[in-house]
């Protein structure tokens, strides 16, 4: 399919009318037939390794299928979405949990977070080490320009796998 070809070349085609395509930064690797016969991106955690796109300033709902490598220490800051210029709205506390409690944007960490469909408090729920679905409906507009790079700072890029990323500029309902 074209999406697999796009991943092979490091280019993700935005399927929305916005045409905000994403380009790989560094050397993330495509793992073919990794999950249910589908490809998965693998990120080493190297500084700046990510996929970047034009800044989206009105993010309201996001779905990820991802896992963090079990070797990542809980003391690492590795946000689920990033910002290459400013502190990411998605910044965690370096405690291994999905969201922070003070760092980042309260629209994210006080939003409606689900892990594999169950409502969780992302401030006290660890990032999954097996491919899992995380969804978030924020309390207001937040922004990002990458998966997942925090200002090109060492130890602040994703170290794990990403199978799916969907970003919406509207707060989707639970129905």
Give residue ranges: language-model regions.
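Predominantly extracellular/luminal cell-surface or secreted proteins
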Residues: 1, 116, 148-149, 168
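Trp-centered recognition loops
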Residues: 59-61, 65, 97-98, 114, ...
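Structured loop/turn residues at beta-strand edges in well-structured enzyme cores
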Residues: 129, 156, 160
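Extracellular glycan-recognition modules
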Residues: 3-108, 142-144, 152-156, 170-175
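Exposed low-complexity, polar/acidic, P/S/T/G-rich flexible segments that act as propeptides
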Residues: 144-148, 160-168
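Beta-strand-rich interaction surfaces with strong enrichment in secreted/lumenal proteins
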Residues: 51-53, 121-125
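Short strand-turn-strand beta-turns centered on an Asx-Gly dipeptide
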Residues: 109-121
């Amino acid at each position: 399919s074209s999406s697999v070809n796009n991943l092979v070349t490091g280019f993700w085609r935005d399927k929305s009318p916005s045409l905000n395509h994403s380009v790989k930064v560094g050397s993330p690797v495509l793992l073919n037939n990794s999950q249910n016969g589908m490809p998965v991106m693998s990120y080493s955690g190297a500084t700046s390794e990510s996929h970047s796109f034009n800044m989206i300033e009105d993010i309201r709902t996001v779905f990820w299928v991802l896992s963090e490598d079990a070797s990542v220490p809980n003391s690492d800051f590795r946000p689920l979405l990033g910002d290459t210029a400013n502190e990411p709205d998605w910044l965690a506390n370096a405690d291994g949990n999905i969201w922070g409690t003070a760092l980042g944007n309260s629209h994210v960490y006080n939003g409606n977070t689900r892990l594999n469909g169950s409502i969780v408090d992302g401030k006290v729920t660890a990032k999954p080490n097996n491919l899992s679905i995380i969804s978030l409906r924020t309390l207001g507009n937040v922004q990002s320009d990458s998966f997942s790079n925090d200002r090109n700072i060492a130890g602040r890029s994703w170290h794990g796998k990403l199978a799916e990323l969907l970003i919406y500029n509207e707060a989707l309902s639970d129905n």
